Amino acid sequence: MRNYIKDAADLDEVELSGWAEDIRRIKSIVFIILRDVTGRIQVTVKSENVKNFDEVYKINRESVLKVHGTVDHQSRSKSGIEIIADSVEILNAAEAPLPLGVVDKVQADLDTRLNNRYIDLRKDENLIIFKAQSTLLWGIREYLNRLGFIEVHTPKIVAAATEGGADLFPVKYFERDAYLNQSPQLYKEILMAAGFEKVFEVGPAFRAEKENTLRHLNEFTSIDIEMSFADHNDVMDVLENTVKNAINTLKNNLGDELNKHGFNIDSINGRIPRITYREAIDYLNSSGFQMNFGDDFSPEAARVLGERYKSFYFITEWPVSLRPFYTMKKDDETTKSFDLQLRELEICSGAQRIHRYDDLVNNIKNKGLNPESFTFYLSAFRYGMPPHAGWAIGLERLTMNLLGIKNVRETTLFPRDRTRLLP
């Protein structure tokens, strides 16, 4: 049975499988640094011990090997142990040269890395990003399950825009036109009418936005919740505690490994500050900006707010003009909505939704949209739709912001942006 490198120190005999990360040859001995997902270990291959020594002697870096041998607990290697091999099976020999180095100090440009992602992801500093992402998602799921949320999966091929915009990818659906879904928003709300009361979804979302920035993707993983008999304050509380639980799960399980790679994760101590959109505008104008009510925040304005609040903070009561048609109004100008920010970066957006049919139809019209395009959605509001609220987080952007990474493509396994459709 295969053993993992992390367990070798507790064993006397092992069978390890992994990649030959580095190779040194000295006459009748080959020293191999073998790597698997749990770590690295030195394997010493001697000509008198291994039948296919000549074949092993010629292997290239990143060849895939299966090694059987004894554990030398008195080794002078860096780890204090090494494997004295009695057999080495070459499972797959790597070609040379590699398209991208794994242990080389030379940094390749991002396009080269993404074009050879299967090599790029072998590096510890890249693997840890996705271990962190997986752990964050585990913490989010665990907390929402504990609160009694039901995980659901909604359609990703739809007949009309979720939010009424033009940023949709068209697809041919047999004889009809369809689109890749921007968001599960409308389906989450329909499930509130179905009596599910508390749902969450983790799934792909698609935006045909032409922005080509460090923060934009055209396909991303969206984490959405919707909750009945709740307002925007209720789901802000859920969001705050969800993020706290995710961060604690991350630190408890990967804290040392993250610190080793220079990732320092923000903690949430006490309540997250909440400021209104008007308060944010007033502060920015007192700092030299010239913003009017209804203006969105420029990157520079967001940076100034981030310098003031340092870590996490909510911006609440956004203008009606800046929110989708399903957002509940607080008054004629503002909505019961919020964004969660980490310094200058948006983490999450949410709101209380309109739950009365006539109000929703009027708001759809006020946004310049046709209610007939939303018949399947609107019908759910005619037969007992409860008050409800929710939010959505982009997993890749959450990972980027928490780890302090500058480009969201680095927190996406195989990014899809304005110019990239491969690999």
UniProtKB/Swiss-Prot annotation:
Annotated compartments: Cytoplasm
Catalytic activity: tRNA(Asp) + L-aspartate + ATP = L-aspartyl-tRNA(Asp) + AMP + diphosphate
Cofactor requirements of the protein: Mg(2+)
Gene name of the encoded protein: aspS
Cofactor comment: Binds 3 Mg(2+) cations per subunit. The strongest magnesium site (Mg1) is bound to the beta- and gamma-phosphates of ATP and four water molecules complete its coordination sphere.
GO biological process: aspartyl-tRNA aminoacylation
Signal peptide range: none
Residues that, per the record, bind Mg(2+) 3: 346
Gene3D superfamilies, sorted: Bira Bifunctional Protein, Domain 2 (3.30.930.10), Nucleic acid-binding proteins (2.40.50.140)
Pfam short name (any one): tRNA-synt_2
Aspartate: region residues: 185-188
UniProt keyword Magnesium present: yes
Protein keywords: Aminoacyl-tRNA synthetase, ATP-binding, Cytoplasm, Ligase, Magnesium, Metal-binding, Nucleotide-binding, Protein biosynthesis
Record's subunit section: Homodimer.
CDD domains: AsxRS_core
Free-text function comment from the UniProt entry: Catalyzes the attachment of L-aspartate to tRNA(Asp) in a two-step reaction: L-aspartate is first activated by ATP to form Asp-AMP and then transferred to the acceptor end of tRNA(Asp).
EC number: 6.1.1.12
Gene Ontology CC terms, in alphabetical order: aminoacyl-tRNA synthetase multienzyme complex; cytosol
Positions of L-aspartate binding: 163, 207, 349, 353
Positions bound to Mg(2+) 2: 346, 349
Protein name: Aspartate--tRNA(Asp) ligase
NCBIfam families: aspS_nondisc, PRK05159.1
Family the entry assigns: Belongs to the class-II aminoacyl-tRNA synthetase family. Type 2 subfamily.
Residues binding ATP, per UniProt: 207-209, 215-217, 346, 394-397
Site (Important for tRNA discrimination): 78
